[in-house]
Amino acid sequence: MDNVNLTDNFLIAMPTLEDPYFSNALVYICEHNENGALGIIVNRPIDMNLASLLEKIDIKLEAENLADMPVYFGGPVQLDRGFVLHRPIGQWQSTLAINSDVGLTSSRDVLSSVGSAGLPAEILVTLGYAGWDAGQLEEELAQNSWLTVPAKASILFDLPPEERLPAAMQKLGISFTQLSDVAGHA
C-alpha cells in the first residue's frame, strides 16, 4: 500500500465502515500524499441550496437557475468552510488542481462568480471535507473499509447524488447488494 496515490479516485464505503459520517458514502479524493489525504463526500446533499448558502455569506446569486442547486455535506472536518469542486479549473485564488480538468477551490472568489461568464461550467458545492492523517487512509484500506475506483468527472457533475454511488460501483462491475461486511483474505 506504500506509494499508492489515490488522488482523482473515488472511495466507496464498505458495509463494515460503521462511522455514520461515511456510511454509504462516495468520497472523491482531491489530494493524497505522504502527509495524508483530503476528500469530498459527493453523494450527501444537505438541507440547504446554493441560494441560501450565498445569502448567508452575503454573495448575490447572479443566475437564478442555480438557486436550487443542492449544497453537500463534504465531510466532518471544517463544517463551516465551503469547498467547490469545479470543471474547468479556472483561475481562482485558492485552487487545488486534482487533474487537468477538475479543481477544488476554497476561496470566496469562485462563489462570487456564480452565474457570471467567469463561472466554472460545472460545480459541486460542499460544506466540510474528509481528511486523513499520514498513513490513516492506507490503514483503513488495509482493513477493507473502502473500495477504490478511478473517478470520472461525469459521475461528479452529470448525475444526481443518489446515482453517483451506484455509478461508481458499476465501474467495478458490482452493486452495493453484492458487498459483504465480512472480510476475507487469501
Curated annotation (Swiss-Prot):
Protein name, per record: UPF0301 protein Daro_3893
Record-linked InterPro entries: AlgH-like
GO CC annotation: cytosol
Lineage, opening ranks: Bacteria, Pseudomonadati, Pseudomonadota, Betaproteobacteria, Rhodocyclales
Top-level taxon: Bacteria
Family, per entry: Belongs to the UPF0301 (AlgH) family.
